[in-house]
Amino acid sequence: MSLNDAKTTDIYRTMIRIRTFENAVRRLTKEGRIPARFGLYTGQEAVAAGVSAHLRKGDKIGSTHRALGHLIAKGCDLDKLMAELMGKETGFNHGKAGPYHTFDPSVGALGANGIVGGSVPMTAGYALANQLEGERNVAVSYFGEGGSNQGGVQETLNLAACWQLPIVFVCENSSPEVQRMLGHEIDYPQLSIDNVSKRAKNYGMPGSTHTGWDAAEVYKAAGKAIRRARAGKGPTLLEFKVHQLEGNLEGRLEANEKERQWDPIDLLKQKIPRKVDEQIRAEEVAKVQKAIDFGVKSPEPTPEQAYTCVFKEAD
Amino acid sequence: MPAREITFGQALNEAHIAEMERDPKVIVFGENVSSQWREATKGLKERFGRERVRDAPITETAFIGAGVGAAIAGYRPVVELMLVDFGLVAMDQILNQFAKTTYMSGGAISVPMTLRVLTGAGTSSGATHSESLHGLFAHMPGLKVVVPSNPYDAKGLLIASIRDPNPKIFMEHRLLYPVKGQVPKEPYEVPLGVANLVREGKDVTVIATSLMVQEAMNAADELKGKISVEVIDPRTLVPLDEEAIVGSVKKTGRLVVVDEDYLHYGFSGEVVALAAEKALKSLEAPPIRVATPNIPLPFNAKLERELLPSKEKIVAAIKQAAS
């Protein structure tokens, strides 16, 4: 299934929303209004947007500690998301989660995760629940090439194949040329192979590697895997090569043509009429500004709230 | 409720059947759970089908994590871990994800999974097949820790655990499996957080859990007529029935804690601290802990017995506390 114009515009809008939101997060972190620095998704927007274009509300995702793109693409409310990043009472998780543990069950966004690869076994559980429900909902498990080596991820690939779970594993490989860890060069490689997707065969599932900054390619590959999962034919491992782009692209990228070619927004923009682009940007800027205002105006949790929610009361 | 005599293992099996019949969201998985040699889950696959009762590969991280995920997504998984020592390979899923998600999500998420775990020494199985480790799990915030000591409690506590909306680790000493006791046929709950006064006494309080409850009772029997021993089984370490423990210590003024888990930084120390904080003025003698020293459990049966709490050690401790 290739992209039609309407889908292209939807995906582009999602990518702009993520980029705009994260640029605001960068600024707010610098200003001290978001209390901690954390990993952002700039350069990877096509993956979350292209995958989520196939997802519906009953589908569930498990994410990473670089989660904002996944959460926004799955439909998380921007106000509550921004408030959570500011640690406010009105956030999704009342300021207890922050960027690493955000949960929004109302849209099936079942968790950013602070442990590399930590959400992957749980996401198999979401897929298991979907399989038992019989509604043909699927789960998408996001992780990076670093996370792909974790024992839990390898174990879950095997489990998902043994149980034929309706799950798509999405590995965002952010070291497409030289292997890096946490953005730094490494002396020994962390992957013994060039493509993570090669491991799929060993676990008895299809796997393929794609250009992650090309939204059309992401959309196509994800569509095939998600349709397969929905049809009850089991898991797929998709790998998308991406470049994590640092800094506010609006300013910096103009000086760096090499990086610019990896910018998924720049690439897709060519298919968007200029007026539509301007309108989308203006609308998304307004939404993000509303989220910032909401977050800034929201109260902090009270000290008493530190003690709540360790356990739930019986139903 | 009319009761009849069945084993601890059969009581667990009945609890599974009762809850799976009552609630279609209860699912079971783990290593070999479809096999007839796993007593607690015996016959479940035949009765409830292979969708709800599944064998998992020997990958504790994956299947415990999948249980956590299924629980988050609205199911009530009962996941079996063959031995607690094997859970150590899955500590991220147990201690980070299972235990903390409710809090981290600000209550947006419930994780109503029951992780059933076999525990315990006394079978000459060596240092990675013999531990108790309830203190380790009780230390971490977010887990309810259940330690049944007899067939009646096993059934009632497991039913209560499955119905509870929180993460539970349900720890079954494997030497308890053949132990018989009176158990009602009907489903019933033994509430989490309520201790059992196993034996009333006035001279010395003995707090014991799991298999050690029986050892404590054997010791109390031996001292019958000489020292009046009160034996309390907390039944759950989290939540802990502090009132029952403190009340008893205030009554007797003397405390012995018996724990098969390691001595240091554990349950036995927790109970002594509780007595010091809330019943210090009632204490007439220093509290005594009978627990396994912090030494990996050896294979040789004599060496293993040397380290574990025993009736003889408990008798000596009670005598010392009473003197």
Predicted regions and their residues:
Chain A
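Short, conserved beta-strand edge motifs with alternating hydrophobic and charged residues
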Residues: 168-171, 208-211, 218, 237-241
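Glycine/aspartate-rich loop-and-adjacent alpha/beta segment that forms the canonical ThDP
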Residues: 228-315
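Short gly/pro/ser/thr-enriched loop/turn and capping motifs at secondary-structure boundaries
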Residues: 69, 174-178, 198, 244-246
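Glycine-rich, charged/polar anion/phosphate-binding loops
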Residues: 153-156, 220-227
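N-terminal glycine-rich anion-binding loops that anchor highly charged ligand groups
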Residues: 13-29
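Conserved thiamine diphosphate
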Residues: 131-135, 189-224, 260-282
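A short, conserved beta-to-alpha structural element at the edge of catalytic cores
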Residues: 163-183
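Cofactor-binding active-site loop characterized by glycine-rich and histidine/acidic residues
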Residues: 23-26, 33-163, 184-197, 202-204
